[in-house]
Design a protein with these regions (language model features):
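Conserved small/polar residues in nucleotide/adenosyl-binding loops
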Residues: 155-159
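Catalytic and substrate-binding clefts that recognize carbohydrates or anionic sugar/phosphate headgroups
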Residues: 1-154
Length: 159
């Protein structure tokens, strides 16, 4: 299942090509801040976080923080926190397994257990965005569902 939430007046990015009805209630594992600029989710001891596209560090993003800000930095090393490209999608694999896509063209801040190892926090510059929660049987199912709702990449990779 894919659930869509909208906050404020989202900027239309055309990243999501399928229509979904808006849902009012977030899943129990997500807690939204009063100003709608951030949300948190508790992490289990063994939870792994995948995603954010071509970013720094290893496969498991847990324990670090990242900024989605599309910087054009020729020397993109592991000590950088700002992502080279904006892929605001990640999957939590653990006690709760789900994917989250933040459809927002401005800065998005991801704290994946950096400040508090047991909590992931996602923040946006302003409360004008769409949030998609993707639930499925497993990580691959969640990724497949997400790929079906986003626009085709302008680059076509050959097998």
């Amino acid at each position: 299942m894919i659930f869509k939430y909208a906050f404020g007046r989202p900027f239309k990015t055309d990243a999501v090509i399928k229509s979904f009805p808006l849902v009012n209630s977030l899943p129990d594992y997500i807690e939204m801040s009063q100003d709608k600029k951030s949300f948190t989710a508790k992490l289990g001891v063994d939870d792994i976080i995948y995603g954010l596209g071509e970013s720094v560090r290893g496969i498991n993003k847990r324990g670090f923080r990242y900024i989605s800000n599309c910087t054009d930095d020729f020397s993109h090393t592991e000590d950088k926190s700002s992502l080279y490209a904006a892929h605001n999608f990640f999957v939590v694999d653990g006690e709760e397994t789900y994917g989250i896509y933040v459809d927002f063209p401005g800065k998005v801040y991801f704290d994946f257990g950096y400040t508090d190892l047991d909590t992931l926090t996602v923040s946006v510059e302003e409360a004008n965005y769409e949030l998609y929660v993707v639930e499925g049987d497993n990580v691959m199912d969640i990724i497949k569902k997400f790929r079906e709702i986003i626009a085709v990449s302008y680059t076509h990779l050959r097998a």
